[in-house]
């Protein structure tokens, strides 16, 4: 083989090897789709629509929001998991969808640690222990005493058995040494109505929509927030951890991509979202919606997912035996 031919073949090989890296560096060259497992108009959907324009500007391509509700998020999860691992399809998830639902709905066949790669954390929202005013308690310690004196008599609202609120409340009961009865409802509007009417007396949930107004006018009472320290989202409400050390029920919302998405693509996506979340005006809008901006990169998010799966595993196992 002559020298010219050898050089030509060597150049062709080098070009072939360089193509994947070149394609990654050019990412994105078409719109990026965010699959949302919730209906349009909800809090998560509203947050993404706030991020849509600044993230698209950062990436240099439009960001498309694709709402795919149903099956407790598993329809959207499967769609995203089966997408090409090229960064053009990402899935928005929360703590329940990434650390609870796949292990409760095993028939869905979605192993989040195997099927997804973390992109970034977007926001956090703490769970708050709410009670109807008819419950004769003024604080969390009194509530625990009352619940222990009335085992199985207090009913709490959940959006479906095995959902985040159900599992988080199970962990709360286990740590507190109390026993309450779950009452499942179809959605957040129904659980809120049940708590306001006194149909149920308790709910551990994140605050959204008009819930803060109900707190202010006394239609419901907040006994504790499930964070390590006080939360700016619910000022004046003491941490549950003051009474139950270590109790944490904060809902994190983040983005994941199909497994095997190139790290450089994950980093570029994550940077675009975390940069957008640094805008003070946007952070203020999120706070008004009951969320705090919590921009964390993919590595930190991956570590959090592992911790969350481990934390909820005991409660999920108990649900399986009921």
Each model region followed by its residue ranges:
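Positively charged n-region of N-terminal signal peptides that target proteins for export
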Residues: 1-6
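Bacterial N-terminal signal peptides
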Residues: 7-18
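Short hydrophobic alpha-helices and adjacent helix-cap/hinge residues
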Residues: 9, 30, 53, 58, ...
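N-terminal (or domain-start) structured segment
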Residues: 23-114, 153, 161, 174-206, ...
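An extracytoplasmic/periplasmic, membrane-proximal ligand-sensing/linker region
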Residues: 29-31, 174-175, 216, 263-322
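Hydrophobic alpha-helical segments typical of transmembrane helices
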Residues: 43, 47, 51, 76, ...
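Hinge/capping helix and adjacent helix->loop/strand transition within the periplasmic-binding protein
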Residues: 79-88, 95, 103-186, 190, ...
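A ligand-binding cleft/hinge motif common to bilobed small-molecule-binding domains
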Residues: 96-106, 171-175, 202-235
């Amino acid at each position: 083989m002559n020298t010219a031919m050898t050089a030509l073949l060597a150049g062709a090989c080098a070009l072939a090897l360089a193509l994947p890296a070149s394609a990654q560096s050019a990412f994105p060259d078409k719109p990026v789709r965010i699959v949302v497992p919730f209906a349009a108009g909800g809090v998560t959907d509203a947050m993404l629509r706030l991020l849509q324009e600044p993230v698209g500007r950062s990436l240099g391509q439009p960001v498309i929001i694709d709402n795919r509700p149903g099956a407790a998020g598993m329809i959207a999860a499967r769609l995203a998991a089966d997408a090409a691992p090229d960064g053009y399809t990402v899935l928005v998830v929360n703590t329940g969808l990434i650390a609870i639902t796949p292990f409760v709905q095993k028939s869905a066949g979605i192993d989040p640690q195997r099927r997804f790669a973390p992109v970034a954390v977007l926001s956090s929202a703490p769970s708050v222990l709410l009670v109807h005013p008819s419950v004769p308690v003024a604080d969390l310690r009194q509530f625990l005493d009352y619940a222990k004196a009335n085992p199985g008599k207090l009913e709490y609202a959940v959006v479906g058995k095995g959902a985040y609120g159900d599992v988080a409340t199970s962990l709360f009961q286990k740590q507190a040494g109390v026993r309450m009865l779950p009452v499942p409802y179809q959605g957040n509007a129904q659980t809120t109505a049940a708590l306001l009417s006194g149909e149920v007396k308790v709910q551990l949930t994140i605050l959204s929509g008009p819930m803060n107004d109900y707190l202010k006018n006394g239609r419901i009472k907040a006994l504790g927030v499930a964070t390590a320290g006080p939360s700016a989202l619910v000022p004046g409400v003491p941490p549950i951890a003051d009474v139950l050390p270590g109790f944490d029920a904060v809902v994190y919302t983040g983005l994941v991509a199909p497994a095997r998405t190139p790290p450089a693509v994950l980093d570029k996506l994550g940077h675009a979202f975390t940069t957008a979340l640094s805008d003070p005006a946007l952070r203020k809008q999120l706070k008004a919606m009951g969320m705090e901006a919590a921009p964390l990169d993919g590595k930190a998010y991956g570590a959090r997912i592992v911790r969350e799966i481990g934390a909820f595993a005991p409660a999920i196992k108990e649900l399986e035996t009921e």
